[in-house]
Amino acid sequence: MRHALGSARRAGAALVAALTWAALLAGCSSVGSGGLDLDRILGKPPAPEDAIRITPDDGGRDVRPGTRLRVQVPGGHLEKVRVTRSQDAQDYPVPGRISADGLTWKPDHERLALAARYTVDAVALDSHGRRSARHTTFTTLVPDERFIAYVTPENRSVVGTGMIVSLSFSREIADRAAVERAVHVTARPPVDVRPHWFGASRLDFRPQRYWKPGTEVSVELRLRDVQGAPGVYGLQYKRFGFTVGRSQVSLVDAAKHTMEVRRDGELLATVPVTAGAPKHPTYNGKMVVMDMLEVTRMNSRTVGFGGEYDIPDVPHAMKLTGSGTYLHGNYWAPDAPGRVNVSHGCVGLRDVKGGSSGTPAGWFFDRSLIGDVVEVVNSKDKTVAPDNGLGGWNLNWQEWTAGSAVD
């Protein structure tokens, strides 16, 4: 599903009500195949690219530094804009301002940085008072004959015990062994941390078991002048680190419509949930919270479902896979959690429009960290792929260590 705004770094039975929710196959942004008209209930939102226009385009690569960065709306006004530049595992806010008429945001300094990833999160109100959110990313030009690594997690962050160190390279790596030898991941207290390649442009690191709470992890990139491919050399020589916070592992039972939340091994709560409907089941397996968004737009077209739904203000969204699985608040099917699975593959918790810390979704969001583990069992789908998000915990240790390029 489509995610947008407010990255928070700190994540079958027939139902009879005013509406027949059993007719609703509510996707990661629940909408129905049985005739339920969410457009009528929620108000028809404009298409994401029409409601909030962002340049450079979402997903852009090798964007040149002279390209103009703008956030614009055709009507109504921009409510909030946050732009972040990420380099060497460090996030830097990009200062800027919204124009007096509320229609345009532009940065204080026009020139984009080289070899950086930019993230744009924007929220706007249209002329009818409907709120929309949009999230886009793009990467800027890396000089010819150089490569860099985009790093997860963020430097100096506090993360959950399931965090996997993930390096995404700007160019395909031919000499994987040379690059692997140039990356050093160490922990205090000491633990064996091993690498695994997913294709030619991604290298992940993890221990055999989840990190112990309190572990301090250091990552050193000694990539400068390392030849990753013929004539292509590394640009970075950086060190960054993160700290593992408390342990929180949540078990979603899709058949029971429940989620058990365990903090440091003790049961904290059992929360009612709604998982993927029979036609769109939720992945089984271990998933790691990759991002946390206070509000997001979820649009079925972004994940191959056609025009089945488009909800502009999904609250408390926690990204679990790169393909678009989220755990999020659900205010449009309030009777579903604990009773029936109605989504297009996400896990939904009861919430209210606009989100509230007093709802199950808000309660869970406020107690979660990026890097927390959410495991799904008893769904009708396959196990999530290990390279879909931070899914590497679904490989056993022998499978994981076999992914090293160094003998």
Tell where the protein language model's regions lie, with residue ranges.
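Soluble periplasmic/extracytoplasmic beta-strand elements of cell-envelope proteins
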Residues: 53, 70-72, 119, 166-168, ...
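Exported/periplasmic cell-wall-interacting domains
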Residues: 161, 300-407
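Extracytoplasmic/periplasmic, Sec-exported soluble proteins
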Residues: 61, 110-113, 157, 161, ...
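Acidic, low-complexity Ser/Thr/Gly/Pro-rich repeat segments typical of extracellular/periplasmic
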Residues: 2-25, 29-246, 273, 404
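Short, charged beta-turn/beta-strand-edge "cap" motif at the junction between a beta-strand
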Residues: 124-126, 223-225, 265, 295, ...
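Gly/Pro-biased beta-strand-loop elements
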Residues: 231-338
